[in-house]
Amino acid sequence: MRLLYTKPRLNDLSQGSRIAFARQFRTMSQDEVSDILGLTGECKRRTMTRYEKGDRNPKLKRLEEISSILKVNINSLKEYDFNNPIDVVYIFMWMEELIPNYVIDVSKVPRVDEYYIDVVKKSIEEWTDMRIKRLRKEISYEDYIEWKLNYEIKEKL
């Protein structure tokens, strides 16, 4: 149970900043995550620091472990491919943490037969529904971030 909540700050869209944001959201220290990962030695925190600063990128297996420890969907922490329309939706969600009033409106985008356009549009509509719930105070900021950190795009419509 949290006694005091401090909103985490996202420095940029890098993988390291997103890992740090998720860790801070979970109110965990780098030492705690390092201990659970089984890192040892005097500088056990160094690996997490390097991940969060972007000096190193975790391999897939390590990223799976980190996402499991932080209880987030791996898609919220993975490296994004700007050529992948699915990844673009996750990027948009993170941009909202950098630019709080950032809004994407897909209501006027025409229906297109292209599969990924439909998937992206549906995902952004789901995200918009959650944003509206947060703005109407139907859900808390913490619940909203929890949803974003665990959101998984379903590629089959």
Regions from the PLM with identified roles:
Residues 4, 10-13, 21, 64, ...:
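Charged, helix-prone or intrinsically disordered regulatory segments positioned adjacent to compact structured domains
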Residues 12, 16-37:
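Short basic helix-loop element that most often maps to the first helix and adjoining turn
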Residues 141-149:
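Short, charged, amphipathic alpha-helical segments
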Residues 59-63:
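Long, hydrophobic alpha-helical segments
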Residues 38-58, 79-83:
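Recognition helix of helix-turn-helix/homeodomain-like DNA-binding domains
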Residues 152-157:
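Short, charge-rich amphipathic alpha-helical segments embedded
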Residues 19, 30-34, 45-51, 66, ...:
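Conserved hydrophobic/aromatic packing and binding residues within compact polymer-binding modules
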